[in-house]
From Swiss-Prot:
<dbReference type="InterPro" id="IPR012340">
    <property type="entry name" value="NA-bd_OB-fold"/>
</dbReference>
<feature type="compositionally biased region" description="Basic and acidic residues">
    <location>
        <begin position="10"/>
        <end position="23"/>
    </location>
</feature>
<keyword id="KW-0689">Ribosomal protein</keyword>
<dbReference type="GO" id="GO:0005739">
    <property type="term" value="C:mitochondrion"/>
</dbReference>
<dbReference type="GO" id="GO:0015935">
    <property type="term" value="C:small ribosomal subunit"/>
</dbReference>
<feature type="region of interest" description="Disordered">
    <location>
        <begin position="106"/>
        <end position="125"/>
    </location>
</feature>
<dbReference type="GO" id="GO:0003735">
    <property type="term" value="F:structural constituent of ribosome"/>
</dbReference>
<dbReference type="InterPro" id="IPR006032">
    <property type="entry name" value="Ribosomal_uS12"/>
</dbReference>
<protein>
    <recommendedName>
        <fullName>Small ribosomal subunit protein uS12m</fullName>
    </recommendedName>
</protein>
<keyword id="KW-0496">Mitochondrion</keyword>
<dbReference type="Pfam" id="PF00164">
    <property type="entry name" value="Ribosom_S12_S23"/>
</dbReference>
<comment type="similarity">
    <text>Belongs to the universal ribosomal protein uS12 family.</text>
</comment>
<dbReference type="GO" id="GO:0006412">
    <property type="term" value="P:translation"/>
</dbReference>
<dbReference type="InterPro" id="IPR005679">
    <property type="entry name" value="Ribosomal_uS12_bac"/>
</dbReference>
<comment type="function">
    <text>Protein S12 is involved in the translation initiation step.</text>
</comment>
<feature type="region of interest" description="Disordered">
    <location>
        <begin position="1"/>
        <end position="50"/>
    </location>
</feature>
<keyword id="KW-0687">Ribonucleoprotein</keyword>
Length: 125
């Protein structure tokens, strides 16, 4: 604990805040190229392998992004769009890939939550 005299001479140093959106440059979405798609096991109580893509963004940052939904069509070096949003049970994964945009297809035959998975509207009978 500093004395009053020390505080008058030097003052207090403010804490530096860490930037949570450093990779995205404050943008809501960011474009990138995916070099590879590994699977990763989640934290303790959960066990299913999570589909995670390492993405090199247009500003040369490398991040890990979650691929939502069942199945995906990732080939070699496709263009993808990234949005924010962490995956609670996967450490270091702070963004999601947007389905149905660029080279990542939406989920076919999906009826509920279609906007989250890039699914087309079903034809009514």
């Amino acid at each position: 604990m500093p004395t009053l005299n020390q505080l008058i001479r030097h003052g207090r140093e403010e804490k530096r805040r860490t930037d949570r959106t450093r990779a995205s440059d404050q943008c809501p979405q960011k474009q990138g190229v995916r070099p590879r798609v590994p699977t990763r096991t989640p934290k303790k109580p959960n066990s299913a392998p999570r589909k995670i893509a390492k993405v090199r963004l247009s500003n040369r940052h490398d991040i890990f992004a979650h691929i939502p939904g069942e199945g995906h069509n990732s080939q070699e070096h496709p263009m993808v769009l990234i949005r924010g949003g962490r995956v609670k049970d996967s450490p270091g994964v702070k963004s999601h890939r947007i389905r149905g945009v660029k080279d990542l297809l939406g989920i076919p035959n999906r009826r509920r939550g279609r906007s989250k998975y890039g699914a087309e509207r079903p034809k009514s009978i």
